[in-house]
């Protein structure tokens, strides 16, 4: 008999991301002004009771509104991609963090903002492997004003 998923797996979980590593599922989510990860050996045991892996210092361009974090294992390390701003939505940008101990549930430190040169609003980024290369895909505005939202892709 095949197990079924219990729905909802968790309540109040906007922008969920789950990855499997070493026979465990890791669920990454925004929580209390930071990014948290919980893990379980079975996906239907995941809960929002995880460890905070990154909490930004106050007063930074990435201190507020951390949205849609994702963790990816790339080039021998764990990276977290998350949208954040300084409290003004127009300043939402994508940031990359790196695990300090090489584990998906380790502490993460800021690497920097992902910058395509436009300075435009950017959220909901993900990594896309395609044709032996990596691409970054995100949703963003076409200008500094919210006139039109598009999906963008760029080689990493």
Question: What is the predicted function of each stretch?
Answer:
Residues 1-156:
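Carbohydrate-active catalytic/glycan-binding domains of CAZyme proteins
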